Each structure stands twice: as C-alpha cells, then as structure tokens.
Amino acid sequence: MLFAILCDDKPDSLQLRLDTRADHLAFLHGLGDGLKFAGPFLGPDDKPCGSLVVIEADSLEAAKATAAKDPYALAGL
C-alpha cells in the first residue's frame, strides 16, 4: 500500500532543515524500493518549507513508524 507523508516545517526552521538535509537524504536512500517519491515544498520565497514523501508500507502503523525515524522528524523540523 502507498502512503503519502506530508510535512510542514516549523516557522523559521530553514537552517535546521539545511543542517539535517544530508542525514534526511541518506535515510530516504536507505528506504530502497520502499521509497516511491520525495521532494520539498517551496514557499513564496522559493525556499523549502516542507516535504512530501511517498512510501510503500504494509500498514498505516508501519508508515507512521517509518516517518517517525526520518531525521527531519527526529530533529523536530
């Protein structure tokens, strides 16, 4: 089953996003074939302000568990 994970960054958190980006990308790469699509949302200033991640998982609970392990989530972004 496919699940879309929609993430809105907290206000004024661009630097946290940039500092955590390499770990986030490594995490996504580690999902292998389970990752179907991922990309940032851009604000009116063309700077990232959130993310969309589409993954394949066996259940909603499994998808939530995967989302909770994302470095962006762990950093409180």
Regions found by a protein language model. Give the residues of each.
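Conserved, structured core segments of small domains
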Residues: M1-L77
